[in-house]
């Protein structure tokens, strides 16, 4: 059985990812993966994608065909486009209904597996110490805060451990984001900086001459 410390950390990490990416984005990705599997909606989703490409291609051909110069070809393309569009709208409407039900089920399961599980763990292990602090290291009021709400005095409660994990994950994410920005940022060429400085100096000089006049 995995350690409770690790379970709480993984749970906070998943919550951070969901909050950063967004619940709607997670739902959309899961819907795409669901349609990649042999599910009841996979064939309809593939057909909808095929029709979507066909509609785009027909639109391009319609735009490149003159209705005055080649009316028969234009009319044929227009009929094909309307037929494909009607079929696509029918399939898309059915898929949207399935997606709404899928999103509702996924949202419920996601809440139960993250927030719901966190509440259950905090309630069930409220009196269980995550780990003990060395005796005499901290003042009484600090030990009381670390053991809040019902853990033994001198230990760290599951609530405090969860807050600590969430804070560490957030700080680590901000640090990685800052490193990524610094690593991918292109340095400004020195020649460009000199040109900008000269242009700024020239502007200041011209404005000073205007004031004297």
Swiss-Prot record:
Coiled-coil blocks: 41-68
One GO CC annotation: endoplasmic reticulum membrane
Span of the signal peptide: none
Residues annotated as transmembrane: 5-24, 111-131, 156-172
Subcellular location: Endoplasmic reticulum membrane
Pfam families assigned to the protein according to its UniProt record, in alphabetical order: CHD5 (PF04420)
GO-annotated biological processes: tail-anchored membrane protein insertion into ER membrane
Entry-linked InterPro entries: Get1, Get1_fungi, Helix_hairpin_bin_sf
GO molecular function: protein-membrane adaptor activity
Domain of life according to the entry: Eukaryota
Cytoplasmic side: 25-110, 173-213
Membrane topology type: Multi-pass membrane protein
Lumenal topological domain: 1-4, 132-155
Keywords: Coiled coil, Endoplasmic reticulum, Membrane, Transmembrane, Transmembrane helix, Transport
Keyword Endoplasmic reticulum attached: yes
Family as reported in the entry's similarity comment: Belongs to the WRB/GET1 family.
SUBUNIT field: Interacts with GET3.
UniProt-recorded name of the protein: Protein GET1
Organism: Phaeosphaeria nodorum (strain SN15 / ATCC MYA-4574 / FGSC 10173)
């Amino acid at each position: 059985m995995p350690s409770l410390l690790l379970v709480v950390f993984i749970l906070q990490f998943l919550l951070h990812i969901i909050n950063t990416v967004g619940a709607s984005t997670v739902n959309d990705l899961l819907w795409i993966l669901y349609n990649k599997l042999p599910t009841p909606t996979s064939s309809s989703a593939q057909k909808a994608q095929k029709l979507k490409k066909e509609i785009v291609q027909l639109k391009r051909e319609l735009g490149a065909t003159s209705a005055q110069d080649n009316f028969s070809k234009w009319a044929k393309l227009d009929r094909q486009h309307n037929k494909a569009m009607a079929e696509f709208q029918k399939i898309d409407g059915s898929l949207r209904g399935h997606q709404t039900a899928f999103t509702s089920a996924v949202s419920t399961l996601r809440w139960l597996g993250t927030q719901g599980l966190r509440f259950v763990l905090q309630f069930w292990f409220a009196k269980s110490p995550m780990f003990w602090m060395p005796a005499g290291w901290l003042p009484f009021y600090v030990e009381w805060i670390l053991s809040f709400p019902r853990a033994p005095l001198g230990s760290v409660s599951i609530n405090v451990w969860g807050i600590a994990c969430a804070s560490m994950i957030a700080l680590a994410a901000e640090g990685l984001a800052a490193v990524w920005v610094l690593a991918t940022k292109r340095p400004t060429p020195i020649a460009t900086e000199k040109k900008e400085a000269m242009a700024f100096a020239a502007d200041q000089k011209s404005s000073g001459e205007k004031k004297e006049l």
